[in-house]
Design a protein with these regions (language model features):
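Conserved beta-strand positions
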Residues: 18, 55, 84, 115-118
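Active-site mouth loops of central-metabolism enzymes
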Residues: 22-36, 85-95, 124-129
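Glycine/proline-rich, positively charged
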Residues: 91-143
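Structural motif corresponding to the early beta-alpha repeats
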Residues: 59, 75-94, 119-122
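Proline-rich low-complexity regions
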Residues: 14, 87-88, 107
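Generic anion/oxyanion-binding catalytic loop in active/binding sites
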Residues: 27, 57, 86, 102-105
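N-terminal binding-site loop/beta-alpha segment at the start of enzyme catalytic domains
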Residues: 1-80, 137
Length: 143
């Protein structure tokens, strides 16, 4: 696996990451993820050197985070950097940040998220994020 510097951090990110937006399904429903196959896929990628896994609150109706959390059990979590995303369109009040973050930590079965991204941040949602102080809230969550 090839690795590259991740911005100005000390982290060397694998040239390939694992994105969990479209996972194998058992049936027609978007949240009906084939969990055993997905866990095998994620762990195979990590065993091959992938060290960046990306998911989001809304992927597969929220089930992507759950299955990613399952895949990262048994020692896999410490081998990767985990990214997920705050659904900016669902943030209506300042406390929504804490509620969403806690829910995502629970789904992912982890105590921390390495990269917490603002999902679908655009001209519509940016003013609300700014007015609610979401960036400051995120900085406080780092501590």
């Amino acid at each position: 696996m090839q690795y590259r510097p991740f911005g100005t951090t000390d982290f060397q990110v694998s040239a390939l990451g694992f994105g969990a937006m479209r996972l194998p399904l058992r049936g027609p429903g978007a949240s009906d993820i084939d969990e055993p196959q997905t866990v095998r896929m994620i762990r195979t990628a990590i065993d091959a050197g992938v060290n960046y896994v990306d998911t989001a609150f809304g992927y597969h109706g929220g089930q992507s985070e759950v299955v990613v959390g399952q895949a990262l059990r048994d020692g896999y979590r410490h081998r990767i950097k985990l990214a997920t995303k705050l659904p900016t369109w669902q943030v209506k009040a300042v406390d929504d940040f804490d509620t969403m973050l806690a829910r995502q930590l629970g789904r992912l079965q982890t105590e921390h998220i390495d990269f917490y991204l603002l999902h679908n941040l655009n001209a519509t949602y940016w003013p609300r994020m700014k007015d609610l102080g979401i960036l400051e809230r995120a900085e406080r969550a780092l501590r």
